[in-house]
From Swiss-Prot:
Gene Ontology MF annotations: histidinol-phosphate transaminase activity; pyridoxal phosphate binding
Name of the molecule in the record: Histidinol-phosphate aminotransferase 1
Keywords: Amino-acid biosynthesis, Aminotransferase, Histidine biosynthesis, Pyridoxal phosphate, Transferase
Residue numbers carrying N6-(pyridoxal phosphate)lysine: K213
Residue spans crossing the bilayer: none
Species of provenance: Bordetella parapertussis (strain 12822 / ATCC BAA-587 / NCTC 13253)
Cofactor dependency: pyridoxal 5'-phosphate
PANTHER family noted in UniProt: HISTIDINOL-PHOSPHATE AMINOTRANSFERASE, HISTIDINOL-PHOSPHATE AMINOTRANSFERASE 2
Tree of life domain: Bacteria
GO annotation terms (biological process): L-histidine biosynthetic process
Family: Belongs to the class-II pyridoxal-phosphate-dependent aminotransferase family. Histidinol-phosphate aminotransferase subfamily.
Length: 356
């Protein structure tokens, strides 16, 4: 601790990202990256943008990118906010929309960046327990007395992978008209229903998505939010008080091309979903309890094997999976859906571990 720190810094518990080791022949199933790579058209667009214009600042409004996103998801361009990854978008959300002096509500088992943002911005929060079978119950988000300072949850939830139907999300939004409800749809393209079509109907709904997962652009850091013009204007005001140029020229070019290449997007996400179902069946055949997943990962536990030890033994075999040392889920592993060959290697390694 430094005597030069601001007082809040010493109270922070920063987010811990998944490890990114530089090891040869590693099967990396721990950070939910897409195994199929970006659209070739996105790579071509990035290469084409890597020219003399890099000496110039990018468009601070990211108009072309916002237009491409709007066209892809069916909203107007002025209903789109873009940021340097959905984590930055979420950071702006907490600053712009959640600092009301009232607790923000989110699930007890959810994206671990939410309490980090609350600590950073000194926002009170209240965790809402998932059900015994790890579902978000819309009834638990009915207002009781004073309106919440905000509501946020992933759909599908992370790390569980379970998803709410669109009408269930709308129940939460409708029940909280005086509260901004943020739906974090990082994994929505792998089998869940997006609530983006509802933003015209509900001015308190904000939808956040990313190009890191289904568009295979985690290395570019591009995320976006969809919502009413008033919510988007609030995010823009915070962004322009922090960094007016969050999206660089290369990221913008690649993201636009990725959003426009619908055929590649559909083909690769369908491949991920098909592999997920095969891997889930294979894990169940080995005795794992596997939660239903609408994401590009599965959440599984084995009744006879400790999760932390399994993760360690898989690592010895150059296979990385994610283990969380958190109450209620410390016996689960979150396993990213890789290629068929990677998932077959995982199953083979588990069979050897169980037989040894």
């Amino acid at each position: 601790m430094s005597r030069y720190w601001s007082p809040v810094v010493g109270t922070l518990s920063p987010y811990v990202p998944g490890e990114q080791p530089k090891l040869p022949d590693l099967i990396k199933l721990n950070t939910n990256e897409n195994p199929y790579g970006p659209s070739p058209k996105a790579l071509q667009a990035i290469a084409a943008a890597a020219g003399d214009t890099l000496r110039l600042y990018p468009d601070p409004a990211s108009d072309d990118l916002r237009g491409a996103i709007a066209a892809a998801v069916g909203v107007q361009a002025d209903q789109v906010f873009v940021g340097n990854g959905s984590d930055e978008v979420l950071a702006h959300v907490f600053m712009a929309l959640f600092r009301h002096g009232r607790p923000v509500r989110f699930p007890d088992i959810s994206y671990s960046f939410y309490p980090v943002y609350c600590g950073l911005y000194e926002i009170p929060y209240q965790v809402v327990p998932l059900t015994d079978d790890f579902r978000i119950d819309p009834a638990d988000y009915q207002p009781g007395g004073q309106a919440a300072g905000g509501i946020i949850f992933p759909n599908p939830n992370a790390p569980t992978g379970r998803a709410l139907a669109r009408d269930e999300v709308e129940r939460i939004v409708t029940a909280n008209p005086d509260t901004v409800v943020v739906v974090d749809e990082a994994y929505v393209d792998f089998g869940a229903e997006s609530v983006a079509p509802l933003v015209d109907r509900h001015d308190n709904l904000l939808v956040v998505q990313t190009l890191s997962k289904s568009r295979s652009l985690a290395g570019l850091r591009v995320g976006f939010a969809l919502g009413s013009r008033a919510l988007i204007d609030g995010l823009e005001r915070v962004k322009n008080s922090f960094n007016s140029y969050p999206i660089d020229r290369l990221a913008s070019a690649g993201a636009q091309a990725a959003m426009q290449d619908q055929a590649y997007f559909d083909r690769t996400r369908q491949a991920v979903m098909a592999t997920r179902e095969r891997m889930s069946a294979d894990l169940r055949a080995l005795g794992f309890d596997v939660l239903p997943s609408a994401a590009n990962f599965v959440f599984a536990r084995h009744p006879e094997h400790d999760a932390a030890q399994l993760a360690a033994r898989l690592r010895e075999r150059s296979i990385l999976v994610r283990h969380f040392r958190q109450a209620r889920i410390d016996q689960f592993l979150r396993i990213t859906v890789g290629t068929d060959a990677q998932c077959e290697a995982l199953i083979g390694a588990l069979k050897k571990i169980f037989s040894s």
